[in-house]
């Protein structure tokens, strides 16, 4: 629904956001086998299995019923999908996303935003170059946590080739598999501008709330600093390919 896209872009502009990101690797939902097996939906459906789970987790149930209902806040005035109607993530993606989205659609969003813009889900040199052509200022090298295309390449393995091909024309953000400070250092040494991570924030938030997230960030900060000292690097500019040793391929 282009009206939803236009509305979101306009709202971001009014709210003075600095940049925008378009995810391009979820045109259809991946085969989420665990979701199929568990019947996971939002909000949860009442089944014998879910009722038994609720009984075993009273704190979760109390938290669920004492807080606001789950809703897609960004689009709640445009659609009721994902609010009162129990839907699986797979169903929502397949109903709301357009599998026919093309480079033309991405370029439309770039021009309408008219500011720093990233494409998330770029995994090849050719697509990185195309992103430059349509006006993107950054890409997120990501395979969506390996949950979309089965057997997809590792994002880390694509960074060096993409950086060599695009030079300093794009910021390259490595997404996926980043769990430790050393992972960040390896990515930067390979040519990434920065790293991003999602599940780490969600796990920390679920386990410890805001303090959990702050603890995560402090751990990451300490690991990066500690390992830079151990590597003999005074600043991030000293992280380059000479700091990496790749396993030889047979």
For each predicted feature, which ranges?
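Active-site entrance/lid segments in N-terminal catalytic domains of soluble metabolic enzymes
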Residues: 1-133, 145-148, 157
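Conserved, mostly hydrophobic/aromatic
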Residues: 22, 109, 131, 139, ...
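Residue-level recognition of oxygen-bearing side chains
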Residues: 127, 154, 183
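Extended hydrophobic/aromatic segments used for targeting, binding, or gating
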Residues: 132, 137-174
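Alpha/beta catalytic cores of nucleotide-metabolism and tRNA/nucleoside-modifying enzymes
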Residues: 157-174, 178-250
């Amino acid at each position: 629904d282009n009206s939803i896209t236009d509305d979101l872009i306009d709202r971001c502009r009014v709210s003075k956001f600095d940049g925008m990101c378009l995810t391009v690797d979820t045109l259809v939902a991946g085969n989420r086998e665990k979701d199929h097996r568990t019947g996971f939906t939002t909000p949860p459906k009442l089944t014998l299995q879910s009722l038994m789970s609720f009984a075993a987790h009273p704190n979760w149930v109390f938290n669920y019923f004492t807080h606001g209902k789950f809703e897609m806040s960004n689009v709640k005035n445009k659609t009721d999908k994902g609010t009162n109607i129990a839907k699986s993530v797979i169903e929502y993606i397949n109903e709301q996303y357009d599998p026919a989205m093309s480079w033309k659609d991405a370029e439309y969003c770039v021009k309408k935003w008219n500011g720093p813009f990233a494409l998330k889900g770029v995994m090849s040199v050719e697509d990185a170059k195309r992103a430059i052509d349509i006006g993107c200022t950054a890409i997120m090298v990501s395979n969506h946590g390996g949950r979309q295309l089965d057997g997809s390449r590792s994002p880390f393995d694509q960074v060096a080739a993409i950086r060599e091909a695009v030079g300093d024309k794009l910021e390259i953000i490595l997404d996926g598999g980043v769990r430790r400070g050393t992972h960040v250092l390896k990515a930067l040494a390979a040519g990434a501008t920065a790293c991003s991570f999602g599940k780490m924030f969600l796990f920390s938030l679920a386990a410890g709330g805001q303090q959990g997230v702050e603890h995560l960030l402090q751990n990451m900060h300490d690991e990066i600093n500690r390992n830079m000292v151990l590597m003999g690097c005074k600043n991030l500019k000293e992280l380059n390919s000479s700091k990496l040793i790749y396993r030889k391929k047979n």
